[in-house]
A protein has these predicted regions:
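Conserved pre-ATP/AMP-binding loop-to-beta segment of ANL
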Residues: 25-26, 149-167, 174, 197-203
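Conserved AMP-binding/adenylate-forming core of the ANL superfamily
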Residues: 26-73, 77-81, 98-103
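Conserved AMP-binding A3 loop
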Residues: 38-43, 163-187
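Conserved structural elements of the adenylate-forming
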Residues: 45-53, 159, 178-199, 204-207, ...
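AMP-binding/adenylate-forming catalytic core of the ANL superfamily
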Residues: 97, 114, 362, 367-368, ...
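Conserved AMP-binding/adenylation subdomain of ANL enzymes
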Residues: 186-203, 213-251, 266-267
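Gly/Ser/Thr-rich phosphate-binding loop
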Residues: 250-255, 264-327, 341
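Conserved ATP/PPi-binding loop(s) of AMP-dependent carboxylate-activating enzymes
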Residues: 334-337, 348-379, 415-417
Length: 515
């Protein structure tokens, strides 16, 4: 088993861990900015084996879900690997989802065991109030979770066995449980490693939660494939980001657009040696505003590679090539290791530069949604393409441009308006850190447009500035009627702005008002 750009990885995640422990036992694979001790491949292998045997001794059936309700850190990472190593299905619980969604995940996954740490104990207890199940709670903060009995045998594992059950954010309904096999999880890490030409000498900075597909596949599984390493942080910190990049000799990082915007508007800058060492920063989970990307690169001198991925595709679908390859600002790039196409509303396949739904096929695509046949059928075409729910087009060079989510499309007076157009116009203002446009019901037009922004501290900007900016860039029809100023916009676990929730947290919703 070797990392090759032209062939997806064979075997299981366990096989790849075994390989590294045998061939590079003393190489550091994971470090932790919170002070947890470093892990070498051999140390990880030893610890994971002991925890996996502990799980087998609990008489858990092969393939059963075991949930993790823990903060980023060494214990969570070890337990993630151990669940897979033991032949079970890891179910990371989204700590930002709220009690009802967590309770649903616990019930729906049928997990009988949940790992928790002290900082997340209250979160878990609140979630358990939303479910009738009674899983065994294993608190890693005060439990010895390892077994050394050599007579305990681990389950045999194959590439097509279930590995991961991860729940979608559920912003438009009940969260769905996405099933990935060992094979598709490895392929998710492989597509990232191929696109970014990751080497064993590369070291990633992970500031995203491991219960999110980006944090998990991009900065945990991709280094497993490439033989590189990753530094895992408890969470994103504007004040610590560049310091951590320098301290740990980071060569690349994976973030989301809101983090890029916060860094851009922050006071700290990377040192010259850090700038030279950083090959690239990776942006995913939401479209990156053109002005934000350009301003970031101009200030910090670090190229940003915009990408696109889903929970259903073990993260990456598309990526821009690394410099000196051609990057197209405003596009998440081209396919690496999988295929993409555009499906038109009538079901026909793509015509270049024509907007339709983005579809993907490849080894990193999920198996199905757990116990949700109807949703699985709607998501896959008859010939096996996964419909992403994103609208976009492919240009003459094969680059995909995303115009928005199908469910977020604003339809005003019968005209389709992409909220991203409005977001990008607002991000052109120097004081805007976060921006999102959204639809409001309207008796005359069906829907009208409002937007929410977060501004830099001490900004004196007023609503008229933003309305006039949108008028000049978009025309009055596409411009928002109202701007909401907020301290924070609602976001999911990766930091992606949850546009649909803006209806609930702003005062703009008034179905009876006529405009």
């Amino acid at each position: 088993m070797n990392f090759t750009p032209n062939f997806k990885p064979d075997g299981t995640i366990c096989d790849w861990l075994n390989k590294h422990a045998e061939l590079s036992p003393d190489k550091i694979c994971y470090q932790f900015s919170n002070g947890d001790s470093d892990l070498t491949w051999s140390a990880l292998f030893d610890k994971v084996n002991k925890i996996a045997k502990y799980l087998v001794k609990l008489n858990i059936n092969k393939g059963d879900s075991i949930a993790i309700c823990m903060s980023n850190g060494r214990p969570a990472l070890q337990i993630f690997y151990a669940i897979l190593y033991g032949g079970f299905r890891v179910t990371p619980l989204n700590l930002a989802a709220g009690p009802a969604a967590l309770g649903h995940a616990i019930s729906h996954s049928k997990c009988k065991h949940i790992f928790v740490d002290d900082p997340q104990l209250e979160t878990l207890n609140n979630a358990l109030l939303e479910t009738d199940t009674n899983p065994k709670i294993i608190n890693v903060s005060n439990s010895l979770i390892e077994e050394t009995d050599p007579s305990i045998k681990l389950h045999d594992i194959s590439p097509n066995d279930h590995a991961l059950l991860m729940y979608t954010s559920g912003t438009t309904g009940v969260p769905k449980g996405v099933i990935h096999t060992h094979s598709s999880l490895l392929a998710g890490g492989w597509t990232t490693a191929v696109a970014h030409n990751l080497q064993s000498s590369d070291r990633a900075l992970c500031v995203l939660p491991l219960y999110h597909i980006n944090g998990l596949c991009v900065t945990v599984i991709a280094p497993l494939i490439s033989g590189g390493s990753s530094v895992i942080c408890p969470k994103f910190s504007n004040s610590n980001f560049w310091t951590d990049c320098e301290k740990f000799k980071i060569t690349w990082f994976s973030v989301v657009p809101t983090i890029i915007s916060h860094l851009l508007h922050g006071k700290n800058d990377p040192s010259e040696i850090t700038k030279k060492r950083l090959r690239f920063g990776r942006s995913a989970s939401a479209p990156l505003a053109v002005d934000t990307q350009s301003s970031f690169e101009k200030r910090f001198g670090v190229p940003i590679i915009e990408t696109m991925g889903l929970t259903e595709t073990a993260a990456q679908i598309l990526s821009n090539p690394l410099p000196p390859g051609q990057r197209k600002i405003g596009s998440p790039g081209i396919a690496f290791g999988n295929k993409v196409k555009i499906v038109l509303p009538n079901g026909d396949d793509q015509i270049n530069n024509t907007i339709g739904e983005i579809a993907v096929k490849g080894p990193n695509v999920m198996l199905e949604y757990l116990d949700n046949y109807e949703a699985s059928q709607k998501t896959f075409t008859n010939d096996g393409w996964l419909l992403t729910g994103d609208l976009g087009y492919i240009d003459n060079d094969g680059y995909v441009f995303v115009s928005g989510r199908l469910k977020e499309l604003i339809i005003k007076g019968g005209e389709n308006i992409s909220p991203r157009e409005i977001d990008d116009a607002l991000y052109a203002h120097k004081d805007v850190i976060e921006a999102a446009a959204f639809a409001i019901p309207c008796d005359i037009y069906g829907q009208r447009i409002e937007a929410a922004v977060k501004l830099t501290k001490n900004s004196k900007a007023i609503e008229a500035e933003f309305l006039n900016l949108c008028y000049s860039k978009l025309g009055k029809f596409k411009a928002p009627d109202k701007i909401h100023f907020m301290d924070e916009l609602p976001k999911g676990p990766s930091g992606k702005i949850q546009r649909i929730k803006l209806l609930d947290v702003t005062d703009g919703l008034n179905k009876n008002k006529v405009y």
